[in-house]
Structures are given as C-alpha cells and as structure tokens.
Amino acid sequence: MTMGDMKTPDFDDLLAAFDIPDMVDPKAAIESGHDDHESHMKQNAHGEDDSHAPSSSDVGVSVIVKNVRNIDSSEGGEKDGHNPTGNGLHNGFLTASSLDSYSKDGAKSLKGDVPASEVTLKDSTFSQFSPISSAEEFDDDEKIEVDDPPDKEDMRSSFRSNVLTGSAPQQDYDKLKALGGENSSKTGLSTSGNVEKNKAVKRETEASSINLSVYEPFKVRKAEDKLKESSDKVLENRVLDGKLSSEKNDTSLPSVAPSKTKSSSKLSSCIAAIAALSAKKAASDSCKEPVANSRESSPLPKEVNDSPRAADKSPESQNLIDGTKKPSLKQPDSPRSISSENSSKGSPSSPAGSTPAIPKVRIKTIKTSSGEIKRTVTRVLPEVDLDSGKKPSEQTASVMASVTSLLSSPASAAVLSSPPRAPLQSAVVTNAVSPAELTPKQVTIKPVATAFLPVSAVKTAGSQVINLKLANNTTVKATVISAASVQSASSAIIKAANAIQQQTVVVPASSLANAKLVPKTVHLANLNLLPQGAQATSELRQVLTKPQQQIKQAIINAAASQPPKKVSRVQVVSSLQSSVVEAFNKVLSSVNPVPVYIPNLSPPANAGITLPTRGYKCLECGDSFALEKSLTQHYDRRSVRIEVTCNHCTKNLVFYNKCSLLSHARGHKEKGVVMQCSHLILKPVPADQMIVSPSSNTSTSTSTLQSPVGAGTHTVTKIQSGITGTVISAPSSTPITPAMPLDEDPSKLCRHSLKCLECNEVFQDETSLATHFQQAADTSGQKTCTICQMLLPNQCSYASHQRIHQHKSPYTCPECGAICRSVHFQTHVTKNCLHYTRRVGFRCVHCNVVYSDVAALKSHIQGSHCEVFYKCPICPMAFKSAPSTHSHAYTQHPGIKIGEPKIIYKCSMCDTVFTLQTLLYRHFDQHIENQKVSVFKCPDCSLLYAQKQLMMDHIKSMHGTLKSIEGPPNLGINLPLSIKPATQNSANQNKEDTKSMNGKEKLEKKSPSPVKKSMETKKVASPGWTCWECDCLFMQRDVYISHVRKEHGKQMKKHPCRQCDKSFSSSHSLCRHNRIKHKGIRKVYACSHCPDSRRTFTKRLMLEKHVQLMHGIKDPDLKEMTDATNEEETEIKEDTKVPSPKRKLEEPVLEFRPPRGAITQPLKKLKINVFKVHKCAVCGFTTENLLQFHEHIPQHKSDGSSYQCRECGLCYTSHVSLSRHLFIVHKLKEPQPVSKQNGAGEDNQQENKPSHEDESPDGAVSDRKCKVCAKTFETEAALNTHMRTHGMAFIKSKRMSSAEK
C-alpha cells in the first residue's frame, strides 16, 4: 500500500459532532486507559521500595533495556509468566513492549557458555520476559518486535516453545523470589515474604496494565530439563569456538551517586542492562553483594542460562540454535541504541573511539528442597580491565550513574497511554557484532511506551559498541542502539510518538543528542503518520496506516547512517489502534460540559435596543447571543489550536475553537462536498495566549468563520468578497418545505381560498397551496418573466406574477397563493412573502452546486470537470500533462526544438474540444441555458440561498426584522397599481435591446439635430450591466458591483449606470446623469446678446447675471432669450411632444434597481396615465374607452340616490364613503362630481385621456410655471417638487393642459 492508496480522513461526521468540548485536557482528552496505568504505576512505586528484582522481559540470553519503575510487580509478573510494561510515554520517547517471542529462525540460546554452577540461578532470571539477558543473545536477525495485546496470549504462549532460554517457568518463579529477596536486603539473601509480596503486586499489576502479556507460567515446566540439557550443549560448542577477551577501557567512568528520583516516566537505557549483565562475571558462589545501589537502576542482571539442567534441552531447541548461529556470523553491525555518556567511548563506531570496561557479575543459584530458587549476585574483579585505571566497583557505579542520569531526567509522568486492548508497541532487536567476531550478539531495546513506533529516531551517530565479558571468559561485543537515532522516518512520527506530551525531555547530550523533542500534539492524517524518508520501505507505511488492524507484521530494511555494509533487519509487530485516533474520537464524541448559552433578549424598554427574537445563534454549538459582535467574538475565541490542511481549500488553516472548524466543514458540506483533510494537529493554547486583542486575534486567526452560514462580520466579508460564489443550500436529504409568509396576517387582509385560481385545483390547507405555487417543475416547466426576467417555478406562479405587471385582478400571491385586495397586495408580496427576492441561479450539471452568476458556474465547470490536454506542436498527439508532452517530444521528435505545448480544452458535457478558453465558455451557454434554478437573496445581508425556507429561517434567526425591503424590479413600492399590459413593455424593451451606443461618444460628437440625437438614445436601453473592462453582462446590480470591485479593484457606488462605467450614490443623481449624458436632454440658456460666442448657461440665474453684468440690461427678457436658442427650443419641444418614449427609456434604467422609498421623477409621470384600461369592479367588464365605461357602470346602481364611483363602478350610500374609497383605492383626494345617472362622462373622458404633451408650447417660461398657482421656477425639477404640494391638482392640471391641446 502506497501513500497514494491511503484514504484521507473523512469529516462527514464532523458536522454532527457539535458537542465537542472546546478545552482539550492534555491528560484527559487524549489519554486512553490512563486510570489503568495509574494503578500500575502506584504498584511499581511500592515495588521499588521492597525489591530491585529485574522486571520481566524477553526470553533468551539477550541484553534488553526496558524502562520499568515496576520492581516487585515486574518480578511478580515474571513469576506468573507475564510481561508488565511501564506506563505509557517516557521522557518524550515512545517505547515498545517486551519481545513476545522470537521467530523460529531468529531465537536462540547461548547459555551454554556459562559454567554449570551458575546455570540454575541464571535460568530463573532470564525467563521469557526478562528485561536483562546475556549479551550472547545478539542475534543475526535484528528485529523490532512488539508485544501483542493481552488477548493474544495464546499466540504468545505458542511462541514460548520456540524461545531457547533453557529456563523453566518454575525456575523463574523460584529464582525471582531469591533474587528479589537479595535485592531488598542488599545482602543477597532472599525472603519468602518478599516473594509473596511480589506475587500479590503482580496480580494487581496484571489487572491494571494494558500492555501485560498474559502467559501461563507453568505450562512448560516439563520442558525444563530438556532446555537445561540444551544449555550444556550450547556451552560446550561455544567454548570450542574460542573465548573472546573484553576490550580495554581507554577512559575512566566517572563515579556519580545514583539518583533517587521517582519519576513515573523514565526512559530505559541499555547501559544499565549491559552493566548489570557484565557484572555477572565477578560473581562468586559465596559472595552475595547486590549489584545495584539505586532503586532507579531497576534492570538488574539475570542469570545466563548455563545450569546443568540445560543439558535437558530438547534437540529441536539445539537445532534452532545451531541454525541461527550460522547466518549471524555474516551480519554486520547494526545501528546502536541508547547508552551512557562514557559507554560510547572506545566503541569502533562511536565518536570517542574507545571501548568501556564492563564490570562482571557472578550469579549463584541454589535450588532448595521445596523447589524454591535462591540466587546470589556478587561483583568480581575484572580479569582484563585492570588497566582501565579504575576499580571495578567504580566502573559499576559509573555505569549505574549513567543509567540513573538517564532515568532521572525531569520529564513528568506520561500523559499518553494506549487504548486498553490495542497498544502500539515496539522493540528493537539489532545485530551488534562486527563481522570479525565469531559470536555475534543481540541487543534488544525495549522501550515501554505505547504510542507510535520510534524507528524514525534511530541514528548510528549515537551508537556505542560495548564489550561484555562473561564469567566463562567469553568476551562479547554488544552494540547499543538508540531509540532516538534512526533517521528513516519523518518528523510526523516523532510528533505522533510524543502525542500530547508537551514537556521536553532532558537527557545526557551524548546519548540523546539526536532526540527530537516534540510538544503535546495529536496528528490525524488517518493518521497520515508515515515515515517519509527514503530509507524506509513501504511495509512500514502499510503497518502505520491501518489504524483498525490490531496486529500487523512487516519486514523493513532500515539502512543505517553508518558504513554502507551495516544494515539491520527490523521486524515490526505493531498494534495500530493508536491512542491518537482514540483521543480524537473521544474529543468528538464527548458531551460538552458547558450548557448551551441563552442570552437575555428582553432589554429594558428605556434602553431603546432592538434585538432579534432568537438572537444570533452559533449553528455549531447552539449558543445564542444578543449582539452580532458577540457571535463574532464567539467564533474568534481561543480554546485549542487546531491545525488542519484542507484538501478542498488546498491550504493550511489554523482554528482556535471547534466551532470555527465545524463552520468551515459546514461550508464545504453546503457546497455539496465533504470536508477532507490530510493532516490535523491538536494543541492546547497556553493560558497567556487565550485572550488576545481583537486586532491580533483577527490577524492570527487564519480561518475562524469560513462558512457562509450565520451572522457576523466574517460572513458579510466573505460574501462581499465572493458574491459570485456558490449558493447556500440545504443537504439533499432535507425534506423540502414550503416557505410561508414571514409574518402572520392578524387583520385578515389576505385570504386563502385553498383553491388555485390558475388551475382550479383544491388543496387541504394553506401549506399545500403554498407548496403548489413554490414547487419547481422540471427544467422545461419553469417560466421566465419577459418583463423582469424573474424565473418562476411553474405555470401557476408565472400566471399570477404576470398579473402583477398587468395590475389585473385577482391579485394572487405567486409565493403562497393568498388573494389580496389591490391596496394590500404590494405590501404582502414585498414585505411578507418576499416575492422579489427571487434571483436566477445556475446549477452545475455534474455536481449540482448552484451559482448565482453564470460566469462563476463556467469557471467552476472548466476548473473542476473539464479536461485539459497538452498537444504536441509537431504531431497530433496530446497528453494530460505538459511534462508528458515534453517527454514525448524528446523521444519522438529528437533534434527538433519545440515550444510550449498547445492547450486544448475539452467540454465535459459533450466532449467537444476547443483551443481557446473563451470559445469553451461561449460553448457552455448552450448547456447552461436549461440549468437555471431559482435562488433567493436576503435583502439585508445579500446571502443567497437555494431554498426559500432557508432564507426565511436565516431572516428570523439573524435579522428578526428586515431593515430593507426588496421591491419589484420595475415598479416603485408605493406607486399605485397601473394596468399597463406587459406586452408593450416587453416589445419596446426587445426593440431597445437590439442596438447599443456609447454615451461618451455622443457627448463628444455633437449631433446637428437634437431630435435625431434623442431618437438614437431610445435604442440604448440594456437589460443589465455590462462590465467595461471584460465585457461581461450581469443581470443583477450587486453582482456587477462585486465583480468590478473584486476583479478590477474599482469601488462602485450603489447605483451604477447601465451605459457607462459611472456610478452614483442616489437614484436621483443617476437619473440626472442619464438625462444629461446619455439622452442629451440638457437645459441650456443661450445669451441672445452674444451672437459671436453663442454663450450658453446651464441655469437661468446665471444667464440673468450674465446679461446684467456684461450687457447692462437690468430686466432681461428671458422669453426672448430662450426663444432665441434653437438647441434649447428643440430640446423643449422634444421633451413636450414625445413624453412616452422618454418614459419608456427611463423605466428600464430603474428596472433592476428597487427605489425603496426614493421615487424618481420619471416614475411619477406614470400618474398621468394611471387609468388607461377601465375595469368594472362589479362584473369585471374592462374597456379602454372611458365613455363606453361610463355608459356601462350605471346599470349597477341600486337606486337613484346612491353614490357611484366613476372610476370602478362601485356604489356607496354616502358621499363620505365614496370619498374614502376614492382616496384609498384610486389615490384621489378630491372626489369628482358624482353623477346620479349618466354624469359628465365626456368631461371625465377628457380628463383621463392619456396626455401626449407634458409642456405648453410657450417655451421655457411656461414650462417652468406652476399651472395651479402660476408661480414660475428656474428649473423643471424645482417645479415638479413644488407641484407635489398641490396633490391631485398637479394631475388635474396636467390633464387639463393636455385636454386643451
């Protein structure tokens, strides 16, 4: 399995884990099984006080270093055949469990080299799990072996038969008791009470330690005699091979007082084991001195199985020893392990180049009649180490001091423990013998942590070669391998190995010079903790990337950084249900200890604060806040540092709380994809960094609120910077619910008939009726309004929407199907059902992601779904990458210099290829045309939603009450309902869309005929906004403004011009700009007294001052001067005689810009032509002939005394009721003369005739004279403003003036 085959962790379930606690306790959040280890540690501490018996470890004559504070319990564990390990992580380095078993080819016993008088004692000490074994067990097959979990005891017990230790379980039991008694009394005498205590402690330790290797201690007692027989045979063979003399020690070992530190997490050192083992040579049968003078140097020497009982060893074991001895002679030295400072001196591969002198220990074993084993351990003077210049006791003390210095490093207790049933354990077994030696030995490094394999920490630079001289004068060269010196793996494993341990480890520089100290971190890359060095093979990656597999073996050839010939063979037996995965799962599944925060949303009445009904809610944890800023601070809070590499964003992100991380994941989920990451690290935030200033918090927080859901400045900023991005959408599994009106209708202004008036279908309730109107048909069933380009979901909604433009009854809401009266209809549609929030969106054919802009969709399809090929410039071959094309050209077209390959774009929907990206984008139009969908834009924050109900929920939760209203695209909100057919607008609009002209060129080039120039401007109307930089067309104003700001760096005001790149802050300024710049309608005043210069003035006052000052005329005749200007006269005539085209030109300018209270003058002129089609409110009769209408409505009069409305035919019993009706419905303040029978129909007909001329032909003066009060104004705008004060007199005067003409 390669890295390419790995699956990155899927965060699909991340959104559901909203109850993640923010604070990650470095000891509780990650620690799995910590309580179990605590009890284990306590028992270990008690064991230290009583005995220094060596803890249990691997079988055979091997040097095994294991970090064990557990003294008595470890001894007890050996009696029972178990292998207790230390707790967790020690000094920042991962350790592995004991070697469960050696392979049949690799395991062997060299116990035959020890005299028979010592066999009995040494057999019991070097049991299956002895932590200290003879260095003669240096095997040719260096391994890293990992203890299986306790539930694998059957496998382990089966391996036991292959372990050639020559030690029987009963012997181990007896000898452990003897050795334990000797250590506790410091005299070498054993006590049965200590043995019993060891047994009791061991039983408790078995229940608490997760790394205990369960073995049946007495299953192989019968093989005891055979194993001892084999030991004798081995001894004879080894003696024949020759005796090795220990190398002299060139340097003196300093004598350091042993430390008494009781740190629960100490890193085991090979020095202690080697020193203790070497001291055996000096032991005599009568001498009973203890080896260790410090409880910290717990790895004590154990017997070398040379007992006469070894002669009983089975032939199978002897054959296995012989078989494994031969290849071991060919193996070079392996990488080294941890050693003391001075032990590296004299080593061939160590920097000092010296070999230390190792003290000897003599162990005597006596089996009593009761079956118990008594052992005595004494130091003896070295035979060949006298020239080292130091006494053996000093050498031993210095070795022990070195070990103590390692064990007493100030790392605190381990905070990372492995899962109870699946610890990740490892051990290192290396071949430490130089090729020249006849008896290669094996050193087993047994760290006791349970997180990640520390193979990546081994370096040969820190290795040491130590000579061990046994009691039979056999000299063994042992290589000590540092657990922190392998360079074949990446630093990610080192971090994972130190999972959340933040404390650094202080160890001697020479032994741990290359150790990488890592803070508390948890890596999740599935966990992507792969060694990335070139020296590690894929088998290690396969082992380290299967978290659910408990036992996995792989053979890795890890090349050492020493001479090329020295390559060690490492075997990994690891359990990869890592504690890191367990830790993060615990974080995800744990319950948030803090209750959901609900603010007080009822401020005092005198405070004048308006709060949303539900506050501002965090969608990740459920907390609500009264202020929007509080929600922003909630997302910016610092609780835990989360570093993640998002595969979709292709960037490294840093979050400081789980809400911001889940919000980012939610953002991807709403886009139709599931968040995936390749690396995730959890780190606690230091207390001094949790509270930061807002400025620094904003700068340091890379991504605190990436999701477009929710309120806050982060959300608004994101939307404004990427308004053309995707639309917020609900998950596909969410049931579609109709969006009901925002507010209830307590006054019953609207009614629901439960019957669709378009298709006559009857529904059960209002919700079903709303679903009928909002349910989108297939793509072909959707309708687009020809007037406002709104996309309607179905035919019924489209028909009711069309009547809005036509102002025809019945006034049916296109959203909910409610029927309203005309006076309440616009309010219901705009404020309650938010009909005008509909926008046109575009759905991706491939992934169904919705975009609000067609350009964004095209870019998405081209970047995500279309293939790009690189064509060879010479031949027709094309390739998927440029390097492939270059390689092809190099091989197929040698000698020909080619340039860059030509890029070919392939359409993902029809497989058509294009050579230009612009051609591809243009081609997309034919596919996207049928992919339009409705999206909904929030009026306040401009967020876009694919479902209307989502927008409604957003408004209720985030805004409460809307501050702005999305009005109709081409009608003012407060305008009366005009009954203008949609066909006229659409026809004129289609004609106007045919041609476009540049307004700037028209201004620069003066037309000889202003009328002609004005006629040309009629063709300029555009349905949207065109970007002047890139010629992109935008149908929505805010999208156009965002595009210009984002793509071209220009700031646009709220009202951009459709015909140029100018923008204005108010609609009035935009109208004036259009009238002057693009329509050429300019009020100018020319001086008649300056015939040469023909000076003109934009204001009448300026002309008057000019005439008075320059020409000395006190009372100038303005009428004469205005008549003298041809340009002004023609402009006025054009303005008066052709008002309708002018209005039609100005209406599309405001088509997509809701006025929201700012009613511009062109729209006000619509009041003149309000009643063009007359409709009888009683029977529905319609006609455009006012005379015919007045002839029709008298038939509905009930009697001669009733008052009938001349506008709609309704009858009233009093004049007051009729006046109220005229004012409310028809916007008429002054009721017309009421006609009892026929009335003055002709006069009303004249009054209501559409006017074709707005101004009198008298010129500028009459144009600016109020026809009600005869007051004259300088500008037409001032006159229009004044006319509003007269109410209906304004409309009457207009109608009268038109009637007179």
UniProtKB/Swiss-Prot annotation:
Which GO cellular component terms are attached? Answer: nucleus
Covalent cross-link Glycyl lysine isopeptide (Lys-Gly) (interchain with G-Cter in SUMO2), where: 459, 516, 980, 1144, 1167
Among InterPro entries, the record links this protein to: Zn532-like (IPR045914), Znf-C2H2_11 (IPR041697), Znf_C2H2_sf (IPR036236), Znf_C2H2_type (IPR013087)
PROSITE patterns assigned:
ZINC_FINGER_C2H2_1, ZINC_FINGER_C2H2_2
Bias kind Low complexity: ranges: 337-359
| Listed GO MF terms | DNA binding; DNA-binding transcription factor activity; zinc ion binding
User: Where are stretches of biased composition, namely Basic and acidic residues?
Assistant: 32-52, 102-111, 196-206, 223-250, 303-315, 990-1017
What ranges of residues constitute the C2H2-type zinc fingers? 616-635, 754-779, 783-805, 842-865, 870-893, 905-927, 936-959, 1025-1048, 1055-1078, 1085-1111, 1203-1226, 1264-1286
- Write out the biased-composition intervals (Polar residues): 84-101, 122-133, 158-170, 182-195
Q: Which domain of life is it from?
A: Eukaryota
Q: Which SMART domains did the record assign?
A: ZnF_C2H2 (SM00355)
**Positions where N6-acetyllysine occurs in the chain:** 175
Q: Where is the composition biased (Acidic residues)?
A: 136-151
Q: Where is this region: Disordered?
A: 26-206, 223-266, 281-366, 983-1017, 1230-1263
Which residues does the record list as Phosphoserine (modified residue)? 130, 133-134, 252, 307, 314, 434, 1140
One Pfam family this sequence matches: zf-C2H2_ZNF592
Subcellular location(s) per record: Nucleus
Q: Which family does it belong to?
A: Belongs to the krueppel C2H2-type zinc-finger protein family.
Q: What is this protein called?
A: Zinc finger protein 532
Q: Which organism is it from?
A: Homo sapiens
What's the name of its gene?
A: ZNF532
